[in-house]
Amino acid sequence: MLKELRIKNFKGWKDTGTIRMAPISLFFGANSSGKSSIGHFLMMLKQTVESPDRKAVFYPGGKNTAVQLGSYKEIVFHRDPKNKISFDYCWELAETLKVKDPISDMIFSGNALAFQAEVGLDKKDQQTLILDRLNYEMLENDEKSLAIGMRRKSENRLDYIVESVRYKLKRKQGRAWYPAATVRFYGFPDEVVAYHQNADFVQELNLNHEKLFRSICYLGPLRTKAERLYSWAGNEPESVGYSGESTVAAILAARKRKISLGYKKTAKPFEEIIALKLQEMGLIEKFKVNPISEQ
């Protein structure tokens, strides 16, 4: 779960300041005060994590995504391409993360991770989006156990320097190569592991970051128009979709699932519960599903 969030130079925000997050966080303000931008930013990061393009620093969205934010110039503060979007957040881990240095045999542990990054346009062409730096901190009860990150070696090149605090990285013998492009906005590339003797744990950091954003869900109105006919090929969708486009498939996939509506109450089939709730809302009189083919 996110504990803190801070965003700089995103849409109408020069600096949000540190926002403390809770299981339920509510934002109040006048129209166009920037409330929605905070959610849009998180959804953009989620879309980027889930995007198949590992080299895309940000994925602002497309036809079937929660948000469509446009180009970098449309999302950066004051639409000034010289501004860089920076952000940091901290989140609790479901399980304690332990890192053992195979060289020193020291063990580092943490129950939370903090992340910072800065993104901007390449100074050469003012078109290419580039990650200038990223940094992870592993925290144990709010105390830093270790930190590791990457920053660009030069503004004119895409080579990165890997730096660490409280954890001594040891390079493998041979020429001192530098890692190239990062994985999206958050990920250490494979070269970091390949060039060092004790950097395997960075893959765990990548994985925990992806788990964080997979746990963040977009809640919004279902706006897909109802259709007369729906086809279902037996697939089991992960959700109903951002616009409800997979609602029918989700219902059909859960036909054999039973849910209890309370303590010591009989579990009922998923379809029956849907029908019951729709009737309680006065939206239907009858709910029935008949297969038109054996599948």
Show which residues each predicted segment covers.
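Phosphate-coordinating catalytic segments in nucleotide- and nucleic-acid-processing enzymes
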Residues: 49-295
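Pre-Walker A-like glycine/lysine-rich segment at the N-terminus of P-loop NTPase domains
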Residues: 1-66, 71
